[in-house]
Design a protein with these regions (language model features):
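Structural core segment of the AMP-binding/adenylate-forming
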Residues: 6-27, 95-96, 126-190, 505
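Conserved AMP-binding/adenylate-forming core of the ANL superfamily
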Residues: 47-50, 54, 58, 66-97, ...
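Conserved pre-ATP/AMP-binding loop-to-beta segment of ANL
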Residues: 50, 65-66, 196-216, 221, ...
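AMP-binding/adenylate-forming catalytic core of the ANL superfamily
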Residues: 91, 135-142, 152-154, 301, ...
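Conserved AMP-binding/adenylation subdomain of ANL enzymes
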Residues: 233-250, 260-300, 314
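Gly/Ser/Thr-rich phosphate-binding loop
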Residues: 298-302, 312-373, 387
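Conserved ATP/PPi-binding loop(s) of AMP-dependent carboxylate-activating enzymes
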Residues: 381-385, 396-427, 465
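AMP-binding/adenylate-forming catalytic domain of the ANL superfamily
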Residues: 524-546, 570-572
Length: 573
């Protein structure tokens, strides 16, 4: 086993794929490793323990084979059963020629097969690219091409959407894609179930990339976030410890498990790491979720703020017994103090705020934190080795307690997006800090309060929408000359999207329905379709001639409150 497989490369540099004598790819081409001295520090402090996810699953299955690992509807899978399922899928994939270093786009909802495939890929040393269930052609084709995926794993039909049709388009548009594997009725594709071949011993290097997470993004299409075994195993283990997960933990995954929060913060992997049970569902409405929580005696779950508020309201009339619940994590978007209070009033002192990101850094309010901290802050960094800087626009530290831009680096925060040299040059400082794009303030106790953001991203109740991506897509509409997408405040989701559109001379700008149909047709995920469309004769510009997003955000706010675009803000009317 090669313990230290990374060479030292600066942020933004490409590291070459390294091939061992046996032909395994050790470091994915296009990933930026941690510098040697930091890697050594993270190992010395016991954060990085040289674990791989394949060895972890085997160790769990050996330690308690008969305990329940996963529950889905009426199905219960023991740890031994999960390991056997992963082995079966690994044999299947090996039979198709999927091998160490290959990337596989995994787009499955919250079903046990997600984890069977995830761990099968770990077995093979192949790398899952975790697409969200709501991603559509635009995102999927991009993810397949960017990762040069050889396979794409989908359900047959999920929530009325036929993934086999999307897969057929992906096969046409992503040249490297060789296999589509379907859970359920395969249609023209390959069933995930089926015969396979022996699995060759895979690579066993903890500093290899274990998975690629998809970023919420701020520019154009989503980016890929390489997470190594060392860093993600630490992410999971430290989160499980902080959240006091143990063998009696019953974690309900109601958010998509392809998202970092429900996967590893501590999520399903945290529950498994602790020897507990994970219950999978994608029905987060309170009727279904509460019934499941009562049935399974769920002790912990994670929600985005809008769902947390809906659940809090539902406790007024719901009769389910939720007394087993000890931890209710809320994160992904800002939870206002008054909403935090509502959640706390409804569920008792089980609320935990989580401020995290797929890129790494996680902040949790501690389970025994004073109520004031839980209501008013978004938590404290998970690791003693998380380095935090709060800076102004020139990267100068702001005085303590002042709001500024959050920069971070640490043992589980990426050093570069996958194959994104140009973006990496600005997304990181020269000394490797990730520019989160979030505006925060640090309290004297070291807790962070998220005050806003500098990045152009709309946070639609936890679903991240990159303004640039929607703008790019809308610009393809034949009647659209120019466009700018901004957030509008929304009581439930926190924010919704508003697209300002300037029509081409003589053309009529598309209305909301037409724009929505157009964007869906182009394969954009449905949650990225603008909630509002407003027409302008021209976009306002700043002194240097850039689109004035500040003015547009203000205008969108006024319009949402009942004004008119032409009266209030169109500079040329
Ligand atoms: C989580 O991850 P992502 O990658 O979908 O989104 C990260 C961004 C952050 O940069 C921040 O802008 C926002 O989402 N965010 C919050 C927040 N938690 C995330 N903004 C305000 N308050 C919070 N509590 O969203 C994520 C990943 C792991 C755990 C939890 C959330």
């Amino acid at each position: 086993m090669v313990f230290i497989s990374y060479n030292t490369f600066g942020a933004g540099n490409k590291s070459p794929a390294r091939t061992s004598q046996k032909g395994w790819i050790h470091v994915l081409d296009g990933c930026t490793p941690w510098p040697d001295e930091l890697a050594a520090r993270y190992r010395a402090s016991g954060h990085w323990r040289g674990e791989t996810f394949d060895r972890l699953l085997r160790a769990w299955a050996r330690a308690h084979p008969h305990r329940t690992a996963l529950v889905h509807r009426e199905r219960r899978l023991s740890y031994a059963g999960l390991e056997a399922a992963a082995d079966r899928v690994a044999r299947r994939l090996a039979g198709l020629g999927i091998a160490a270093g290959d990337r596989v786009v995994l787009q499955l909802p919250n079903i046990p097969e997600f984890f069977a495939v995830f761990f099968a890929l770990q077995r093979l040393g192949a790398v899952p690219v975790l697409a969200l269930p709501l991603h559509r052609r635009s995102e999927i084709v991009h993810l397949c091409r960017l990762s040069e995926a050889v396979a794409y794993v989908v359900p047959d039909v999920h929530q009325g959407f036929d993934h086999r049709e999307l897969a057929a388009e992906a096969l046409k548009e992503a040249p490297g894609l060789r296999h589509v594997l379907v859970v359920g009725d395969p249609g023209p594709h390959t069933p995930l179930d089926g015969p396979g071949t022996d699995v060759p011993a895979g690579p066993d290097d903890p500093s290899d990339v274990a998975l690629l997470l998809v970023s919420g993004g701020t520019t154009g299409l989503p980016k890929l976030i390489p997470r190594t075994h060392d860093d993600y195993a630490y992410n999971v283990r430290a989160s499980a410890e902080t959240c006091r997960f143990g063998p009696d933990t019953v974690y309900l995954a109601a958010l998509p498990v392809a998202h970092n929060f429900a996967l590893g913060c501590p999520g399903v992997l945290g529950a498994l790491h602790a020897g507990g049970t994970a219950v999978l569902t994608d029905e987060p409405d309170p009727d279904a979720a509460f019934a499941l929580m009562e049935r399974e005696r769920v002790t912990a779950t994670a929600l985005v703020p809008p769902t947390a508020r809906i659940w809090a309201a539902a406790t007024e009339w719901a009769e389910a017994d939720l007394t087993a619940l000890r931890l209710l994590q809320v994160g992904g978007a800002r939870l206002l103090p008054e909403h935090a209070q509502q959640v706390r009033d409804a569920f008792g002192p089980v609320l935990q705020q989580v401020f995290g990101m797929a890129e790494g850094l996680l902040n949790y309010t501690e389970p025994d934190a004073p109520q004031d901290v839980v209501l008013h802050t978004q938590g404290r960094p998970l690791s003693l080795d998380d380095e935090i800087r709060v800076v102004d626009e020139h990267d100068r530290d702001v005085p303590p307690g002042t709001t500024g831009r959050l920069l971070t680096r640490g043992p589980y925060t990426l050093r570069g997006y996958y194959r994104a040299d140009e973006h990496n040059a600005t997304a990181f400082t020269a000394d490797g800090y990730y520019r989160t794009g979030d505006l925060v303030r640090r309290t004297p106790t070291g807790h962070l309060v998220v005050e806003g953001r500098v990045k152009e991203q709309i946070n639609r109740g936890g679903d991240k929408v990159a303004a640039a991506e929607v703008e790019e897509q809308l610009a393809h509409h034949p009647a659209v000359l120019d466009t700018a997408v901004v957030p509008v405040p929304d009581d439930l989701l926190g924010e919704r999207t508003c697209a300002f559109v300037v029509p081409r001379p003589g053309a009529t700008a598309p209305g909301r329905n037409e724009a929505a149909a157009f964007l869906r047709e182009r394969g954009l995920a449905p949650y990225k379709v603008p909630d509002r469309i407003e027409t302008l004769d021209a976009l306002p510009v700043t002194a240097v001639g850039k689109t004035d997003k500040k003015a547009l955000t203000e205008l969108a706010r006024k319009l949402a409150a009942g004004g008119s675009a032409r009266k209030e803000g169109n500079p040329r009317s």
